[in-house]
Amino acid sequence: MGKLVALTLLGACLALIGERLLNFRERVSTTREIKATEPQNCHLIEGLENGSEDIDILPSGLAFISTGLKYPGMPAFAPDKPGRIFLMDLNEQNPEAQALEISGGLDQESLNPHGISTFIDKDNTAYLYVVNHPNMDSTVEIFKFEEQQRSLIHLKTLKHELLKSVNDIVVLGPEQFYATRDHYFTSYFLVLLEMILDPHWTSVVFYSPKEVKVVAQGFSSANGITVSLDQKFVYVADVTAKNIHIMKKHDNWDLTPVKVIQLGTLVDNLTVDPATGDILAGCHPNPMKLLIYNPEDPPGSEVLRIQDSLSDKPRVSTLYANNGSVLQGSTVASVYHKRMLIGTIFHKALYCDL
């Protein structure tokens, strides 16, 4: 009898794992023909060769770019080099990327920047918040931006037990931000198991000096996050679920779901067009090529624009699409005055006029 029970349980477990493996394959093996779409006057940005995972642009047109991310399971073209933060001035006729010098107590050799977000205080001082993965841990680094010197001063490192496996961040006040956790576990084996079983345990965390709490959960893999222009709604990308969650922000910083927009492609980072309020999404149209990288058959890139996101019928259009021949593994697109920057996990970055 005992052996029969054991065999029954084993069979049930194997059946569950088999079903979950098929489900995982379905989620990440999207293979569809990419119809090339390119705005006028696009060119690769010189000096950005090792990824440009996230981009955030100040209202003045200064764009911060995080580069050199080393992420488990993803390719890295310069695995032994620390990450950098670059700056581009989109007011210039021919903007160029320059690496920002960093001063302060940060161990720059362990800089492994992921999501970034800017905040401007009442005296117009700009601060850059950076999700960092030193030795594959998760911290949030706070920098003060010195515009005249074009440099960053490291002010503080934030750590918390809820800030584990952090992917992206959106800052709404001094040391007040939402952060996404793309995995519940942190060990590589358990992360793989989590990806296969897909328990929907990832979440959005609110951080402040007085309170840190989970404000939304139940995502397959919470990824990019941003906020509407009026700061009433928070947009969360659920990458492997291929959708965007629109959440209402309350005075106590809690989030409640409003709607979900299905996109049919893996959604990475999100930004908002400051001129229109439209959501821009950096996407992965053929994600299996990210996991099994072949330079002869590279992953493509895709940027979607979502208009009227709160309406019954949001309008989704393609701003950029490429099969990987130009740009591989797009993660983010950010715009300023009809100029668009597109970043990638490990590849290059693209500038386009819209």
From Swiss-Prot:
The enzyme's E.C. designation: 3.1.1.2, 3.1.1.81, 3.1.8.1
Binding site for Ca(2+) 1: E53, N167, N223, D268, N269
Entry-linked Gene3D superfamilies: TolB, C-terminal domain (2.120.10.30)
Glycosylated residue positions: N50, N269, N323
Subcellular location: Secreted, Extracellular space
The reaction(s) this protein catalyses: a phenyl acetate + H2O = a phenol + acetate + H(+); An aryl dialkyl phosphate + H2O = dialkyl phosphate + an aryl alcohol; an N-acyl-L-homoserine lactone + H2O = an N-acyl-L-homoserine + H(+)
Binding-site residues for Ca(2+) 2, renumbered to this chain: D54, I116, D168
Matching InterPro entries: 6-blade_b-propeller_TolB-like, Arylesterase, Paraoxonase2, Serum_paraoxonase/arylesterase
Processing and modification events after translation: Glycosylated.
Cofactor(s) named in the record: Ca(2+)
Disulfide bonds: C42-C352
Entry keywords, A to Z: Calcium, Disulfide bond, Glycoprotein, Hydrolase, Metal-binding, Phosphoprotein, Secreted, Signal
Catalytic center residues: H114
GO molecular function annotations of the record: acyl-L-homoserine-lactone lactonohydrolase activity; aryldialkylphosphatase activity; arylesterase activity; metal ion binding; protein homodimerization activity
GO biological process: carboxylic acid catabolic process; establishment of localization in cell; lactone catabolic process; negative regulation of superoxide anion generation; regulation of cellular response to drug; renal sodium ion transport
Main localisation: secreted
Role, per record: Has low activity towards the organophosphate paraxon and aromatic carboxylic acid esters. Rapidly hydrolyzes lactones such as statin prodrugs (e.g. lovastatin). Hydrolyzes aromatic lactones and 5- or 6-member ring lactones with aliphatic substituents but not simple lactones or those with polar substituents.
Protein name per its UniProtKB record: Serum paraoxonase/lactonase 3
Organism whose genome encodes this protein: Mus musculus
Lineage: Eukaryota, Metazoa, Chordata, Craniata, Vertebrata
Encoding gene per record: Pon3
